[in-house]
Amino acid sequence: MSEERETLREKLLSPRKNGYDRIKAEELQAMERYCGLYKTFLQQGKTERECARVAVEVAEKAGFKPYERGTALTAGDKIYRVNRDKSVMLAVIGRESLAQGAHIVAAHIDSPRLDLKPNPLYEDSELAFFKTHYYGGIRKYQWVTIPLELHGVVAKKDGTVVPVRLGEGDEAKFVITDLLPHLGGEQGKKPLNEAVPGESLNILLGSCPSGEEDEKDRVKMHIREKLFAKYGITEDDFTSAELEAVPAAQPTDIGLDASLIGAYGHDDRVCGYAGLRAILELTSPAKTAVCMLADKEEIGSMGVTGMQSAAFDTFMHDLCDGQGVPLRACYENSFCLSCDVTAAYDPNFPEVFEKRNAAFVNYGVGLCKYTGARGKSGASDASAETVAYVRRVLDEADVLWHISELGKVDAGGGGTVAMYMANRNIATLDAGVPVLSMHAPFETVAKLDCYMTYKGCKAIYEAE
């Protein structure tokens, strides 16, 4: 092939390349450092409350202050607001007026899990169990026979809130039992999504009785006594509790080359941490940078801590009010990176992916012009101009990225917070880390993609 022809091909075509063939050698150490911090974040935050608490802790160490309505702000000021201990909004005030808009990274810090029912504790056949109600789109069969922990809070009538963390470290774990294959013939004939009914996701708590032999429910009573001794909570207190069963597995490197990270909660804490870490490192951006760590995305972003709540609007209104800028005027000139994970192409399940438009591990940030299902139902569908803007910003910052869709057109679908940000008249584009085994109790991501997503968030914050 002639040199002229080869030059023309390079100009007109854009073949995808593995990120390790493109990343600068000096960035590999920075990538490992970043991923080490991310694994620590995952280890400390297995629920949305814990993630919010850790986010505030690291933000305060970076100089962020809690924002009180009416406080005068100047360029470079670093502030945050916590919404009901479950979501966090952080901002670094820009040099330009908010009339010129803000640059926002919105991610979520809730993940699929098993919540305890309001009246969860019972005994059957001298075994004690907790009843659960699954949260988010789980594949129920994946949650049986794996070690579990219990995290959350119990709110008492007197207003006391008791934090609960059971099963950590060397502590005894919990588990949901399953049928042995010798007796599982009928179960095996059922469709995968029916083989393990939601009502059978009961957590095994113990088997040791207490008290006298003629007492009723002695195993349940033994569990009650232990919970009261450790936390001072009674059976009635479960009525006002938020207790979540989460996988006990700790974040770990995956592969002989340690190029991947396996953990619970990559969706979407891998993007939430990217947005958080990037804003912590800002000094005085041109436009006000805002990081939104939302709750409730996995069940539709509803409720007071979800992205559909007015909490974000209230925070932004307070910032705009301090500059005499109408909120809607700020929104129409703002940009939001809806930072959420996407499905990584899995060669073990090629039938659900359209390979030319799939996200790949180690190819950098996966940009998604639209999500939704079937005919783009439930998608914000970013404009061509918005996608072009992000392309330019990422390229200028040497961020590796590739365009992607979730899967084949009629294979299924999914959604993010993008539509709720776009409904506010904020130009929005989805982008995030490609994930293998998304929504499983143990998901896998590539370190390179994690690092590039952090770089991408920082580039958006710093863009003119």
Residue ranges, per PLM feature:
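N-terminal hydrophobic/helix-forming segments and targeting peptides
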Residues: 1-464
